[in-house]
A protein has these predicted regions:
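Nucleotide-activated sugar donor-binding and catalytic core shared by glycosyltransferases
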Residues: 1-410
Length: 410
């Protein structure tokens, strides 16, 4: 029987992949191997492997890769990220050598995925990549994402403009599909919690006005060296802006493991402990997170969930800085600089928009319809393509560069 491997390394990634993983596991045409790695296996990031176990997803293998070596420059500087990539190359190289899956499914733009894809490429294992063609000009993710595109054989884009961009990079249009975003599918199909259920589960006052906050380090912030200093400085600005709104409660999820992430989390642990209107959690899990966003006044930070999931729920987003610059953004996304006064003004604007959405049903529905990331049937569309390709005796990995028609004779 043929084998498909699907890799998840972070809480956000697993939440997005969940509907696809369910369909993969239910398919009897092949064996699905779920490989868990990265921050899932680390206590500092909430041991989010427990969420996967709680969903009764069979974990085929756990491959620890995250560097926890503490040195004078911090545990998550650029060198530590490099060490994590090296561990991923070694660990997944051994896995691919042993198992030889017929297809590897990866999502997004994280550096560990670059190493995992390189190991698969060396083992001549075809790669199916989700969320290629996107832009996040404030992060190193752009370079990683585009490299993953060139290493992959099948491409599942979340919007038409991203599908076109993948083709623009020389990928054969017959292997590039606009399927929408799995995050939108989660919203449409997951039974989310009521405010009362959420308050009991997450232990915060969900019945009063609140915002959901996630702020990750910006890995390509110009003129910032080291990156940790920029991350901490911007987080201080955000904390000061939140303190200016004592009438709001702030539910804060920890930053990711990018360079500067641990410094942000350490700052949050120290600064929020005595704040009556702030609660810090390592991870909410997909269902609680989406439930929290659904009932929030707005989403605050620089996470892609504010660009994809929040608009699909009809919730405004205050998008801080340029980490998500280049993505398609709904009209409910309000951009601002990572400075206290700009953040306060953007929060005020988001609150006004939130009130308009609350009382104007037509506006609420219009904002949801204008969400550019698909119709909620993404996993079904991906499965249809996979079933077609998995019937082939073999996949020819030799790829011809596709020149755009209007450039071929210039």
């Amino acid at each position: 029987m043929k084998k498909i491997s699907v890799v998840t390394a972070t809480r956000a990634e697993y939440g997005i992949l969940k509907p696809l993983i369910r369909r993969l596991l239910a398919c009897e045409q092949w064996e699905t191997q779920v490989i868990v790695t990265g921050t899932h296996l680390e206590a500092a990031f909430g041991n989010t492997v427990q969420e996967i176990e709680g969903d009764d997803v069979p974990i085929y293998r756990r491959i620890p890769i995250l560097n926890t070596e503490n040195d004078a420059s911090g545990v998550d500087d650029a060198y530590a990220v490099t060490l994590t990539m090296a561990a991923a190359l070694r660990g997944f190289g051994a896995y691919f050598r042993e198992e030889q899956p017929d297809l590897l499914i990866i999502l997004g733009d994280r550096t560990e995925m670059l190493a995992i894809a390189a190991a698969a490429m060396n083992a001549q294992i075809p790669i199916a990549h989700l969320h290629g063609g996107e832009l996040t000009q404030g992060a190193v993710d752009d370079c990683v994402r585009h490299a993953l595109t060139k290493m992959s054989y099948l491409h599942f884009a979340s919007a038409e403009v991203y599908r076109e961009r993948i083709v623009q990079m020389g990928e054969d249009p017959s292997r590039v599909y606009n399927v929408g975003a799995l995050g939108v599918e989660n919203i449409m199909n997951e039974k989310l919690m009521t405010p009362q259920e959420l308050a009991a589960s997450a232990d915060f006052p969900a019945d009063q006005p609140y915002a959901v906050v996630t702020f990750h380090p910006v890995t390509l912030e110009q003129g910032t060296c080291p990156q940790q200093e920029a991350a901490v400085r911007q987080m201080h600005e955000l904390l000061d802006a939140m303190r200016a709104r004592p009438d709001l409660f702030f539910l804060i999820t920890k930053a990711n493991s990018d360079a500067g992430g641990r410094q942000i989390n350490e700052l949050l642990e120290g600064e929020t402990a005595d704040e009556p209107n702030m609660k810090l959690v390592a991870s909410l899990g997909m269902k609680r997170y989406l439930s929290a966003v659904k009932h929030a006044q707005f989403v605050l930070g620089n996470s892609s969930s504010g660009i994809i999931e929040a608009p699909a729920l009809g919730v405004p987003t205050v998008n801080i800085g340029d980490r998500q610059q280049g993505r398609i953004m709904a009209k409910s996304v309000i951009g601002c600089e990572p400075e206290r006064s700009a953040m306060i003004a953007a929060m005020d604007q988001a609150l006004r928009l939130s009130e308009r959405i609350r009382v104007d049903r037509q506006l609420r529905e219009r904002l949801r319809v204008e969400n550019p990331y698909g119709d909620g049937h993404t996993s079904e569309k991906i499965m249809a393509v996979l079933e077609q390709y998995m019937k082939l005796d073999r996949i020819d990995l030799k790829k011809k560069f596709y020149d755009l028609p209007d450039l071929q004779h210039q």
